[in-house]
């Protein structure tokens, strides 16, 4: 995997605005370097200081890092704390009790607000209700819920009593839900009658019932149902209870259960290359520390900020930057039930205007789809909305193409808002490589520099460091507090997946190709290692070819995959969404030729796609991620055998198959 060629040349640089630097939590590159130097000089002391300063401990820790069972590292192991206490009591005690914790906007546009005092009372009532059902410390609880205040309450209540939650995204099928229920050994499932998305109801309770009827789910004793819409649902006497009834009559206070710092706060499933999902296990102490620190560092959180992360609580972004980080930091945050295109593609901009959002954090794929919508319909263009409240933008989930970055910076940020392009993963717990908005000069398409304490490097397939300018494998050389602890029930898979022997067994394998700039030291993510293309012996990252395509004024979105080719070994296949209607026939052939030539000029002839297909959209999960595995199957002409239960737009698959 060494020797990936970096073909994307980006020379635009944006310095942090002086007014932003003046008030930043980390102001200027000298402040960043000072923190990095502290971590280099005394790694354990650096993390110990931060953990003592930022977390509330029931029992202070005496040991910082234990590496004796590497790669099964532990942090602050003899300390005890509670995540819910750090998110709720902290705010009751420091003057935030009557501050709005969550502004919830439902799919239909209705709004509810809840203060920290009210949220604390709700969490306590529900936690007491869970205890009354016999749910205890160490039990696993599956949460299969819509985006809602109740979803956050369920997660916080589990943390409060020491139960380990496993949130399953509301778009997953009954089979996918059942696999997770069985693998984690859940004793309870918390769900809703329905969830609303884009004006449509999805029957969560019916899906949960189907999952629980499958073999292996017998350990589930309780199903708790949040009545979101009031729709009639099947009811199993003795097993099923309404959420409000579980809370009814319970006290507004609930003593927290202190847990060890290494106690599993949650298990979150992520896709595995072999098909079986991986249960990523996260700790309480180290994870919560990083969730809080990155809120303060990357998002430069201020006391009066309104923060909005558009992710779902079913994904890690919704755990760290909705359920835990903002609450631990005492933020006011927006939680949104719906989708960015309902009732129209101006929904995000309308909500920023309505709630006076200061920090907006979303996915590049959402940005690209909204660029297309704005080009097609002036009424949904962001220029029609007052976005002056924004002071910081962020992106998450995949690399952002430079041209999408520029549109975001200009049209949403008004040219004044720094953009934090954050690289991280389910397994890392929080941001790993990201600009600090008051310190780092920004380069479109680059996630810039590792955060203080994160020892990122680029190596070859034997684990040897590569020189700057040469693409290779992204790794992390030292353990960090928020890292994955194991794969639930499968420690050997954990070791092989993340600390492979061929890299020496002690380097964390991120699974992404990356290159570090010779001049700045900035990291650019080139795509997943398994997305690297090898065309006539030239190794190229898909992200760079996609960026070249999206830089064309006709193109809204593009995804690039490889397929076998007798002549070149691998051929580049591009799936393209234009800013206008999908072309056909001679017109499609002409635009494809023009785009090939465009890529040839932007990168070089070697990067020209052999096959370009046009679609109305790309296959995406409900969280907005492009499902590249499906595109690889289409490019190869194979039948699609992968799980498509999270696919937002199944009809697009047939369209792309036929678009030859």
UniProtKB/Swiss-Prot annotation:
Enzyme nomenclature, EC number: 6.2.1.1
Molecular-function annotations in GO: acetate-CoA ligase activity; AMP binding; ATP binding; metal ion binding
Positions with a binding annotation for ATP: 397-399, 421-426, 512, 528, 539
Catalytic activity, as annotated: acetate + ATP + CoA = acetyl-CoA + AMP + diphosphate
Residues annotated as binding Mg(2+): 550, 555
Pfam family membership, one: ACAS_N
DNA-binding is among the record's keywords: no
UniProt keyword Zinc-finger present: no
One GO biological process term: acetyl-CoA biosynthetic process from acetate
InterPro entries cross-referenced by the UniProt entry: Ac_CoA_lig, ACAS_N, AMP-bd_C, AMP-bd_C_sf, AMP-binding_CS, AMP-dep_synth/lig_dom, ANL_N_sf
Annotated positions binding CoA: 197-200, 317, 536
NCBIfam families: Ac_CoA_lig_AcsA, PRK00174.1
Name used for this protein in its record: Acetyl-coenzyme A synthetase
Source organism of this protein record: Ralstonia nicotianae (strain ATCC BAA-1114 / GMI1000) (Ralstonia solanacearum)
Gene that encodes the chain: acsA
